[in-house]
């Protein structure tokens, strides 16, 4: 599986991996279709890069 890094607005210098535990709710709504672009809403996401 591919790993994604999300760059957050409150810490632009650092990119953190999205945490699945907090993203469970978002997962159910979108499913596999928009799974790649969607990250945790708690963080204000700027970019998600595939690595």
UniProtKB/Swiss-Prot annotation:
GO molecular function: DNA binding
Disulfide-bond pairs as recorded: 7-15, 40-48
BP GO annotations: chromosome condensation; sperm DNA condensation
Keywords of this entry: Chromosome, Developmental protein, Differentiation, Disulfide bond, DNA condensation, DNA-binding, Nucleosome core, Nucleus, Spermatogenesis
Xref: InterPro entries: Protamine_P1
Main location class: nucleus
Record's function text: Protamines substitute for histones in the chromatin of sperm during the haploid phase of spermatogenesis. They compact sperm DNA into a highly condensed, stable and inactive complex.
Family, as annotated: Belongs to the protamine P1 family.
Protein name per Swiss-Prot or TrEMBL: Sperm protamine P1
Organism: Capra hircus
């Amino acid at each position: 599986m591919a790993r994604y890094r999300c760059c957050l607005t409150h810490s632009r210098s650092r990119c953190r991996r999205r945490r699945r535990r907090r993203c469970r709710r978002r997962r159910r709504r979108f499913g596999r279709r928009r799974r790649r672009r969607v990250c945790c809403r708690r963080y204000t996401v700027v970019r998600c890069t595939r690595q």
